[in-house]
A protein has these predicted regions:
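Acidic-and-aromatic substrate-binding clefts and catalytic sites of carbohydrate-active enzymes
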Residues: 1-4, 25-34, 111-112, 145-146
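Contiguous, well-ordered alpha-helical segments that form the cores/surfaces of helical PPI scaffolds
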Residues: 4-5, 231
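Acidic, His- and aromatic-enriched active-site or binding-groove loops in soluble protein domains
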Residues: 7-49
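Active-site and substrate-binding clefts of carbohydrate-active enzymes
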Residues: 35-65, 70-291
């Protein structure tokens, strides 16, 4: 997922590149009134000026074919299809210039669904690309090293590489309830940090100054409690807990994911010297499995 706010943070942290879905590029160009030529779908872009990270937008169809379809195909037949698509793309591009087709798999591990953990497919993939006269494989860093051109975005429409939006993580009443629990716990946590003098000022790449926890400040209780509290809050904020709420991603482990999420909220509060909110002790009902 990316947004203009996230890209500012990435620039501050000096990330060289990030990646997301081509749908985010299409929405961003529409938002900014830009109409890129088809060739510009196969190059990185930048938003935010010099020093901002390059953004690569994956080819959704081909990436999902590798991630979700080709495990059911003979590796040779699958690569025949993939090479055919890549050759078609290449014929539609100018002769001169550096272009690439980003193949970025979904977050799940695709290879466990392939026979032999994907070894036969990967050998076919790298062998066929290496032997092809007009195609070669590359990392994103290598592509940038070769000096390929970057498109400049005037706006970035916030979105993920799943449908180019955030509906997987928000919108359902149970997902909303999870966000409410997180927001309340985060507000309590930040108030405790402010009261304890545990916030420092951090300047972002665009010049804005924002508060951030200072891990060198000793929290309440044992030395290191504040660092552990920060880690617990980060665990609650940083994973796909909301993916599993609602009815769009069924799982038999809904109760376990819910317990883990609320456990991180309670741990963060306790380690920061707070009494965990009582509502974090009650399960969030889960449509996709046991509740």
């Amino acid at each position: 997922s990316i947004s203009e706010t996230a890209l500012r943070v990435f620039q501050t942290e000096e990330l060289r590149w990030v990646a997301t879905d081509q749908g985010v590029l299409e929405h961003s160009c529409a938002l900014g009134g830009q109409d890129p030529a088809p060739a510009r779908h196969f190059q990185p872009w930048r938003w935010g000026g010099e020093g901002a990270p390059a953004v690569f937008f994956r080819d959704t169809g081909l990436s999902d074919a590798v991630g979700f379809r080709y495990q059911e195909r003979d590796p040779v037949a699958a690569m025949d299809e993939l090479i055919g698509h890549l050759e078609t793309i290449r014929r539609g591009l100018p002769e001169e210039g550096e272009f690439l087709v980003p193949l970025i798999l979904d977050g799940e591990n695709a290879w466990e669904a392939y026979p032999g953990s994907g070894e036969a497919f990967l050998r076919e993939f790298y062998g066929r690309i290496a032997a092809h006269p007009n195609l070669h494989w590359s990392t994103f860093s290598d592509h940038l090293d070769r000096g390929g051109s970057l498109g400049m975005l005037t706006h970035v429409r916030a979105g993920s590489w799943i449908r180019a939006d955030f509906t997987t993580w928000m919108g359902h009443p149970q997902k909303t309830r999870g966000w409410e629990l997180l927001a309340a716990a985060r507000d309590d946590f930040q108030a405790a940090l402010e009261a304890g003098g545990a916030l420092r000022k951090v300047t972002l790449a665009d010049g804005r100054t924002v508060p951030a926890p200072d891990p060198d400040v000793v929290g309440p209780g044992r030395p290191g409690d504040l660092a552990r509290a920060m880690a617990a809050m980060a665990d609650a904020e940083s994973s796909d807990w909301f993916w599993w709420y609602g009815d769009d991603n069924p799982t038999e482990y809904g109760r376990e994911f819910d317990d883990l999420f609320r456990g991180h909220l309670r741990n963060a509060a306790a380690l920061a010297g707070l009494t965990p909110r009582p509502e974090t002790a009650s399960p969030v009902p889960h449509d996709g499995g046991r509740s």
